[in-house]
Curated annotation (Swiss-Prot):
Annotated segments matching region Disordered: 43-68
Family of the protein in this entry: Belongs to the universal ribosomal protein uL4 family.
GO aspect biological process, one term: translation
Coiled coil region boundaries: none
Pfam entry (one): Ribosomal_L4
Keywords from the named record: Ribonucleoprotein, Ribosomal protein, RNA-binding, rRNA-binding
Role noted for this protein: One of the primary rRNA binding proteins, this protein initially binds near the 5'-end of the 23S rRNA. It is important during the early stages of 50S assembly. It makes multiple contacts with different domains of the 23S rRNA in the assembled 50S subunit and ribosome.
Gene this chain is encoded by: rplD
InterPro entries in alphabetical order: Ribosomal_uL4, Ribosomal_uL4-like, Ribosomal_uL4_dom_sf
Protein name in the entry: Large ribosomal subunit protein uL4
Quaternary structure, from the entry: Part of the 50S ribosomal subunit.
Length: 202
């Protein structure tokens, strides 16, 4: 077991070494990030080729005798309202990553945050109201300007207070992902969330 000090109450909290002192695996973390980002892609981009655009079945003018350049269809990619030469199609970008690998990747990231001092533990995190101003005041008191806050359960006040801020994000233990963990300078975790993380990544 290892220990970490909470920044608000200065109490010692024991952490599971298997979760918070895991060997960093850069290749696995990269794979988890790429998989997560690809799975978030909609893949809805779609265009039409010359054969898919409606119309253009008739030759616009005779091959010879008009003095104009020859043309076979008004839906040529060279023409306005024509098809696209290399049209993009709907595509499924999703990738599969085994649960064990995904958990190990999260362990690697969390352990690295712990080693570098960017994992901050608080006894509890609650806002008295839903105002963004008060949420920012709370973060300024902790001297944290850019952070992901992980709670066991996200309350309405905390969610609404942080929703409009680009430098902060808030989530519960079940929705943590590798991209969010790496995106912010600090990761603030409550004591209750620490216990749930240990259960989830065991």
């Amino acid at each position: 077991m290892m220990e970490i000090t909470t920044i608000d109450t200065k109490s010692k909290l024991k952490l599971n070494k298997e979760i918070f002192a895991y060997t960093y695996n850069e290749g696995l973390v990269h794979q988890a990030v790429v998989t997560f980002m690809n799975n978030a892609r909609s893949g809805n981009s779609a265009q039409k080729t010359r054969s898919e655009v409606s119309g253009g079945g008739k030759k616009p003018w005779n091959q010879k005798g008009t003095g104009r350049a020859r043309a076979g269809t008004i839906r040529s990619p060279l023409w306005r309202s024509g098809g696209v030469t290399f049209a993009s199609k709907k595509r499924d970008y999703s990738q599969k990553l085994n649960k064990k690998m995904y958990k190990r990747a999260l362990r690697s990231i969390i352990s690295e945050l712990c080693r570098t001092g960017n994992l901050v533990v608080v006894s509890d995190f609650q806002c008295d109201n839903h105002k963004t101003k008060d949420f920012l005041k709370k973060m300024n008191q902790m001297e944290i300007s850019n952070a992901l806050i992980i709670m066991s359960e996200v309350g309405e006040n905390e969610y609404l207070g942080s929703r409009n801020l680009i430098d902060y994000d808030i989530c519960d233990v079940t929705t943590i992902d590798p991209v969010s963990l790496l995106r912010f300078e600090k990761v603030v975790v409550t004591e209750a969330a620490i216990k749930k993380i240990e259960e989830q990544l065991q």
